[in-house]
UniProtKB/Swiss-Prot annotation:
The chain crosses the membrane at residues 2-22, 74-94, 135-155, 177-197, 255-275, 284-304, 332-352, 357-377, 381-401, 421-441, 501-521, 550-570. One of its GO terms (molecular function) is potassium ion binding. This is Potassium-transporting ATPase potassium-binding subunit. Part of the high-affinity ATP-driven potassium transport (or Kdp) system, which catalyzes the hydrolysis of ATP coupled with the electrogenic transport of potassium into the cytoplasm. This subunit binds the periplasmic potassium ions and delivers the ions to the membrane domain of KdpB through an intramembrane tunnel. It comes from Microcystis aeruginosa (strain NIES-843 / IAM M-2473). PANTHER family: POTASSIUM-TRANSPORTING ATPASE A CHAIN (PTHR30607), POTASSIUM-TRANSPORTING ATPASE POTASSIUM-BINDING SUBUNIT (PTHR30607:SF2). It is found in: Cell inner membrane.
Amino acid sequence: MLQGWIQIALTILIIVAITPFFGRYMARVFMERRTLLDPLCDRVESLLYTFVGVKGKENMTGWQYTRAVLYSNAVIAILVFSLIAGQGVLPLNPTGIPAPSWDTTLHTTISFITNSDQQHYSGETTLSYGSQIWGLGYQMFTSAGTGLAVGIAFIRGLTGRPLGNFYVDLIRAITRILLPISIVGAIALIIAGVPETLAGPAILPTLENPNLSQAIARGPVAHFEIIKELGENGGGFFASNSAHPFENPNGFVNLVQLVAILSIPTSLIYTYGVFADNLKQARLIYLIPLGIFIGFTIITAIGEYNGNQAVNSLLGVERAVNFEGKEVRFGWAQSALYAVTTTATMCGAVIAMHDSLMPNGGFATLSNLFLQIVFGGQGTGTAYLFAYLILAVFVTGLMVGRTPEFLGRKIEKREVVLASFLILLVHPIAILIPGAIALAFPDFQGISNPGFHGLSQVIYEYASAAANNGSGFEGLGDSQPAPLAIAAGAKPTITALWWNLSACFSLLAGRYIPIAALLLLADGMSRKQPVPATTGTLRTDTGLFTSVTAGVILILGALTFLPILALGPIAEAFQITRMIG
């Protein structure tokens, strides 16, 4: 037990230690200050600026930035959809896999362009190497870069600067942050045992009978794996994601993945502190998601260590670790930490089956998806956190009779409406409406578990899509037959069609509506004239205000989603307790 807790503590300490250094580096990149990569990147970026037609790095308004995001993402999505749809006749397809069904192709394209990487397919039987490398790999960089660019634009606006230029921010995010770290990380993963090959499946004799053979899937995994984690993408090369020994063979690779997942979203808060020239406030704000993250990790780890008490009572033991759905090489501690990390950061990669988590883990992972700020998605998570902070400023100002201001700029009706729209409307609608429809029509469901856990499966699917996370409780009939099976006569199902199309709604609504609202909010803040601080100004860089902000986050999250949590993991926990009695 002690060893498991030490593993968790050391991982968190590593993340906390690198946050200020990486956060300061990202600030230098986007404030266009000198970095070590300038001699190489300046030339490459100049060529790319010329190619995309960026002249003079002109600043964009909120609407211009939003349109640039939408147009570029739409073009990329069309290209990738065409590539996957034509993979049967394209190169790098050693197993001759034909194109997937149109709804699987559509869902996959939208899922990866929104940085969700929700997968209703098995990578080794559905996509060619070309689709994985040229299509999904390309989207992993551009979707992560898009989120990071939006987060930086929001920080600029919040601190009174112009929003910047989307194309410049996207290119700098890729060339100076995502690509260099991915190159180094991929080399480290290859050295640690992650394969990187264009050869087809390995045909080997089985252990039981040397006269029989088996096909072992492999491929260019290492370079795919590192951007999967660093960009908070989460989509696996194989069906079992990072539980697969080729994606995550040992404890060292697992640690690299955890650090990669957490590095950008945690450091971006410190980046804000550099932009605002207020590192004290950044450190205090950092404590909010860090505290919630540690709390959820402890809750999940305790549940997995104690196991299912109903099963334990039948076995006649007081405690037995819940090893269902877990890899023995990672154990209960790393599985719990990874589950909380991947849902807190909207990465979505998994090393254990979330469907097999105890109710503690189900509560923690669902809560992360509902809140979206522990530490949140690539760039957008930090922006969501500050949207909560703006609401906290407004509420606190009304309570104490002081002018609601943030960084010397008044918080007025427009800011409150946009922040409330983000938190109280878009996310719940994208989750609860399709969830209600799925539960109301049995033909759509394909749910493997009745009762409370089945409800959690359905809501988790849409919460994961709306939060751009991509992980799943699974247990749903959301996968069409593999392309080779369809070619052999298997029929696509209406259940999988429903899940693919309804999840697309949640993916798009949960990605682009919040991005537009965040950019408009930031644009409005950037245009406000700063007001000199007076004795009536509410200070936002104090421990008291930080505590109030944490309270606002928990209260708003509880008010919106507590009924779902009560009918899902909380009710499931009481059900297990009743079985013991």
